[in-house]
Regions:
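N-terminal loops that bind phosphate or other acidic moieties
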Residues: 1-133, 137-380
């Protein structure tokens, strides 16, 4: 029996690879000779760096960068040496989890550290980037990142504008004569699952500003300043289009990537499935196992397990999913390629107990074992 396991992390409990190894252990308790291949899985959000880097035999790098408020923070990203690929999450340098709730103010938060991470990876030889941009604390249009990469986002005195969204109103001109030379050799696959534009009622300020600490007055101001920035960008780079879907991602960071770098915005799960070459493994499998922390109606809206199931169905493979918990509306998963799903909780416990990594691992191994015992009965 050949089984391919690609399971997303159970957030707060098991990483993608830890969950996958637990599944493998459960299978081998029943089928000791089974060929089980564990592949990393993520959707471009939290956990992507660890899952892809470790799952593809890369290495994790630590670098000190400028945090959202200008204070130094330690950011971690991954490098795949063979393909000169860097795997990053912008939240490592400019994420909302780095900002205390009472401190949140997008007028002051910057993406400068994101640019520093990119520069560090370029200095280490990377030319291909996989970039997750969820969970941002910023609304600076990616200006901070661009400044760190050598772009001049200048005020009337020829000085770099201030950090944060407040700096957008200061922009007088944009220069690129000091951009790091290697940037033109780099390509970026940006994991982006939002379609919001840069400005307007569905723009980043209006939709995501409140969760970053913006007041109604701030939202109105930031939207005008971003429009000003977009106009100047368009004069410098005609390809810039503030109305393109995804330009409002991460407080306008999507706009900066599309306008100033060789970047494409793509579904996070699409990037991960392609970069890990999961399809090659699924082709040769007898059975595919996937899952995530919680299976519900949202799972069918482009979450990682459904991406795995779609590939499996392309080759007529059966799919089993395991998850920390399952809601009543998870039945929709059966209509989207998951043949059967199982929660791993084995008794009534507190949330803390359920999420304990030792308990989660034990529950996964034991649940998988029992499901595969049933498969063995059927095979006999």
């Amino acid at each position: 029996m050949k089984v391919v396991v690609a399971i997303d992390s159970l957030k707060g409990s098991l990483s993608s690879l830890e969950a996958g190894e637990a599944v493998s252990e459960g299978i081998h308790k029943v089928f000791p000779r089974a060929e089980v291949t564990v592949r990393p899985l993520a959707d471009g959000g939290e956990g992507t760096v660890e899952a892809l880097t470790l799952g593809m035999n890369g290495r994790l790098e630590k670098v000190i960068v400028t945090g959202p408020f200008g204070r130094h923070v330690e950011a971690i990203y991954g490098i795949l040496e063979k393909s000169k690929t860097a795997i990053m999450e912008m939240s490592a340098a400019a994420g909302i989890t780095l900002v205390d709730e009472q401190e949140r103010n997008p007028l002051n938060t910057t993406t400068y550290g994101v640019g520093e991470m990119i520069k560090d990876a370029i200095d280490k030889g990377c030319r291909h980037f996989i970039m997750g941009i969820g969970g941002s604390a910023t609304n600076d249009g990616g200006v901070g990142m661009l400044q760190a990469l050598g772009y001049g986002i200048l005020d009337k005195e020829g000085k770099q504008v201030s950090f944060g969204a407040k700096g957008l109103k200061e922009i007088d001109r944009i220069t690129d004569d000091s951009v790091i030379l290697e940037l033109k050799e780099c390509s970026f696959r940006v994991a982006c699952d939002v379609t919001n534009t840069l400005c307007g009622e569905q723009g980043c300020s209006a939709i995501f500003g409140p969760q970053k600490g913006a007041t109604p007055d701030m939202i109105e101001q930031m939207d005008k300043w971003l429009a000003h920035y977009a106009r100047l960008t368009g004069e410098k780079y005609p390809k810039a289009d503030r109305n393109q879907a995804g330009t409002g991602a991460a407080g306008g960071l999507g706009f900066a990537f599309l306008s100033y770098t060789n970047a494409v915005l793509e579904s996070g799960i699409k990037i991960i499935l392609e970069e890990t070459r999961l399809e090659e493994y699924v082709k040769a499998a007898d059975l595919v196992v996937t899952g995530e922390g919680r299976l519900d109606a949202q799972t069918v809206m482009g979450k990682a397990p459904i991406g795995v199931a779609e590939i499996a169905k392309k080759y007529g493979k059966k799919v089993i999913a395991f998850s920390g918990c399952v809601t009543e509306d998870a039945v929709e998963c059966n209509n989207h390629g998951i043949d059967a799903y199982f929660p791993i909780l084995r008794s009534v416990v507190s949330l803390e107990e359920a999420m304990d990594s030792k308990n989660a691992r034990k529950n996964m191994v034991e649940t998988v074992e029992q499901v595969f015992r049933l498969i063995k009965i059927y095979e006999q």
